[in-house]
Amino acid sequence: TLAAAVDHLICIHDFEVPFYEPHGLACTVCGHPALGRYTPGDGAALRARQGFTPTEKIILVLPGSRSAEIRRIGPALWAAAELLDRDRDVRILTVAANSVREQVTAQVPATVRILDESEKEDAFAAATVALAASGTVTTEVALQGTPVVVGYKLGWITWAIARAFL
């Protein structure tokens, strides 16, 4: 069990403590960095700026902020978004960090609108659903009240090591 393997558990969220303590785990909540920098987004304003109606569905694709993430998980997220794009009332957006904007631009389908990082909170709030690489962004999107489908793809060496234990 987890209690046999660790002496003390560092939790990100307060709601984790009541789950772990009854199993004999001492817990300390350290918090999450996204909670300290949360800014409410204005989804209606983003929809107006982009010319979207209130009824159009917005799929927000967030393939990561690091080159390796974008290379590994990006294609799967874009493939899922393209399946959803068959509906005429769907718009696909992405927010690209400045450090990977060129890489994201080269990867996205032509119908995708690429937003500046300064619009991320508004995009998070405007989205009907987000398809996101696992990371801090999933918490940031969830704080805006938007459902998130989280994806992750291991590198082949990590996968091979993990597979040996499963």
Residue positions per predicted region:
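Nucleotide-activated sugar donor-binding and catalytic core shared by glycosyltransferases
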Residues: 1-166
